[in-house]
């Protein structure tokens, strides 16, 4: 999808659609101009109550040929109501309105559209408040591009008669202010790149486990590298993983007939030969049965999403490539299946991790931390500035935080603060959880250095405590995305989170 900026007006702009906005019970500037040209039909929609003052409510307005309006159609979208004596509008209302516009246009025959959201920055307009801070036109443009790109995503891979792709291919951000027009250009590029990264993450997550295997992820890494000279990739197979002494990782992989893979992608958009990279580590369990500690059958199909951490690393890399980001990032994926078999690990088995620490496997369904702990040891060789692991790690995090916030743990507060700020800026928030020594005792084992579970109390915290024992040599953060990586129910599918958070962090790290 192509994004442009242009100084234009809704009357003379020829496009498939003009998107204009209402706020409170009034039309914004461009909508008012169109209302005059179209005989008051927009204001009538407001007065009649057909378009309610709720964020995201929208209405198609017919454009008669004799009106002089060059757009083929008009979409009127409501931004909701202002607050504090009409001086502020919540950023969430703006997001809802843009989301609604993107969804409507992706389902329409319009091939291009012009969006007049810049009316929110006219003199006397209310301030857009984003978690206590004012949001500028660049932030709005970034969110707009991201939302339009993600609205265009369709999962078609395994349908015999796939749904056709949306017609929309070009979106123009209209503004009559030259300074703002220049400012939003890079924001549109960033938002579109993040949207493309999120769509890759969604696609990988949505694929079934019989297609998206560890070997398939290796091929995806090769495809990214083939398209970008700044990205190199390599992978280690299961024998090489075992030879490195990654006993925890191998204990998970050995139950499957499919070879595990450790995938390394290095994007070098900045820095010399000795520059320290930021490292992303993704949990890539392409299907999780629970192993010998078998999961219940209900909803087990959703365990194809257990590689959401790996998918988000791919998505972040894709976004960095798309925007030609000036950063040095290494993404490492621990890819395996967790399957029951005669070779699979059993509850009570004890393995030696790459770090030399021994682990009693009390539950084979706590496998994510086993593949991650060895990968976190492996990445020490890169002498990283920071390491962020991303994993659909615990159901306990879903109980604690639901499906809105990603759980964040860190051994360095400065790193945690950067990630929290990145999440707020990207509208992809995380919430910091405790990583206190008090919880470490729950991992005690009578037979090994530690157990791989710490009991039901504070399960997300003890999982993070387990990982923290393998991250002593660098600043580290853990993102538990079990509640945010996918949706269940009628809208079942990968969300593309936390790609926005990760990219925002890496660009400002």
Swiss-Prot record:
Catalytic reaction(s) noted: Release of an N-terminal amino acid, Xaa-|-Yaa-, in which Xaa is preferably Leu, but may be other amino acids including Pro although not Arg or Lys, and Yaa may be Pro. Amino acid amides and methyl esters are also readily hydrolyzed, but rates on arylamides are exceedingly low; Release of an N-terminal amino acid, preferentially leucine, but not glutamic or aspartic acids
The keyword Phosphoprotein appears for this protein: no
GO molecular function list: manganese ion binding; metalloaminopeptidase activity
Residues given in the record as Mn(2+) 1 binding sites: 288, 365, 367
Active site: 295, 369
Transmembrane feature ranges: none
Free-text cofactor note: Binds 2 manganese ions per subunit.
Protein keywords: Aminopeptidase, Cytoplasm, Hydrolase, Manganese, Metal-binding, Protease
Binding site for Mn(2+) 2: 283, 288, 306, 367
Coiled-coil portions: none
GO annotation terms (biological process): proteolysis
Main location: cytoplasm
InterPro entries per UniProt: Leucine_aapep/pepB, Macro_dom-like, Peptidase_M17_C, Peptidase_M17_leu_NH2_pept, Peptidase_M17_N
GO cellular component: cytoplasm
Cofactor(s) of this protein: Mn(2+)
EC number: 3.4.11.1, 3.4.11.10
Subcellular location: Cytoplasm
A Pfam family: Peptidase_M17
Class of enzymatic activity (EC top level): hydrolase
Family named by the database record: Belongs to the peptidase M17 family.
Function noted in UniProt: Presumably involved in the processing and regular turnover of intracellular proteins. Catalyzes the removal of unsubstituted N-terminal amino acids from various peptides.
Protein name: Probable cytosol aminopeptidase
Species of the source: Teredinibacter turnerae (strain ATCC 39867 / T7901)
Taxonomic placement: Bacteria, Pseudomonadati, Pseudomonadota, Gammaproteobacteria, Cellvibrionales
């Amino acid at each position: 999808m192509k994004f442009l900026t242009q100084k234009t007006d809704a009357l003379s702009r020829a496009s498939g659609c003009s998107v204009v906005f209402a706020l409170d019970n009034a039309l914004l500037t461009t909508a008012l101009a169109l209302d005059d040209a179209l005989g008051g039909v927009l204001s009538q929609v407001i007065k009649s109550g057909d378009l309610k003052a709720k964020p995201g409510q929208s209405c198609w307005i017919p454009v008669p040929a004799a009106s002089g309006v060059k757009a083929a159609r008009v979409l009127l979208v409501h931004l909701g109501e202002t607050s504090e004596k009409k001086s502020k509008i919540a950023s969430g209302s703006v997001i809802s309105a843009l989301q609604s516009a993107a969804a409507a246009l992706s389902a329409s025959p319009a091939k291009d559209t012009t969006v007049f959201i810049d009316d929110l920055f006219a003199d006397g307009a209310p301030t857009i408040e984003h978690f206590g801070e004012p949001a500028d036109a660049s932030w709005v443009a970034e969110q707009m591009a991201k939302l339009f790109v993600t609205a265009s995503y369709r999962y078609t891979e395994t349908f015999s008669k796939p749904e056709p792709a949306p017609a929309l291919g070009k979106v123009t951000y209209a503004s009559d202010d030259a300074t703002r027009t220049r400012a939003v250009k890079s924001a549109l590029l960033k938002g579109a790149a993040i949207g493309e990264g999120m769509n890759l993450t969604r696609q990988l997550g949505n694929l079934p486990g019989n297609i998206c295997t560890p070997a398939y992820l290796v091929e995806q890494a090769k495809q990214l590298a083939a398209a970008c000279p700044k990205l190199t990739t390599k992978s280690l197979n299961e024998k090489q993983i075992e030879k490195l002494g990654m006993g925890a990782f191998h204990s998970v992989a050995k139950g499957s007939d499919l070879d595990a893979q450790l995938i390394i992608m290095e994007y070098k958009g900045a820095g010399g030969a000795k520059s320290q990279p930021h490292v992303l580590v993704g949990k890539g369990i392409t299907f999780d049965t629970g192993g010998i500690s078998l999961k219940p059958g209900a909803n087990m199909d959703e365990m194809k999403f257990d590689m959401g951490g790996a998918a988000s690393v791919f998505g972040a890399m894709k976004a960095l490539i798309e925007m030609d980001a000036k950063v040095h990032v290494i993404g490492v994926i621990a890819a395996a299946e967790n399957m029951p078999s005669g070779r699979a690990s059993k509850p009570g088995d004890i393995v030696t991790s790459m770090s030399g620490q021994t682990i009693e496997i009390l539950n084979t369904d706590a496998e994510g931390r086993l593949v991650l702990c060895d990968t976190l040891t492996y990445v020490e060789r890169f002498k990283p500035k920071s390491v962020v692991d991303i994993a659909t790690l615990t159901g306990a995090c879903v109980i604690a935080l639901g499906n809105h916030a990603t759980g964040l743990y860190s051994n360095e507060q400065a790193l945690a603060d950067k990630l929290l700020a990145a999440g707020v800026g990207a509208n992809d928030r995380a919430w910091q959880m405790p990583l206190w020594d008090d919880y470490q005792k729950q991992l005690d084992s009578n037979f090994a250095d530690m157990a791989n579970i710490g009991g039901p109390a504070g399960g997300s915290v003890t999982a993070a405590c387990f990982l923290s024992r393998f991250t002593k040599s660098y600043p580290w953060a853990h993102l538990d995305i079990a509640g945010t990586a996918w949706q269940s129910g009628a809208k079942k599918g990968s969300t593309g989170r936390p790609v926005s958070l990760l990219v925002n962090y890496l660009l400002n790290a």
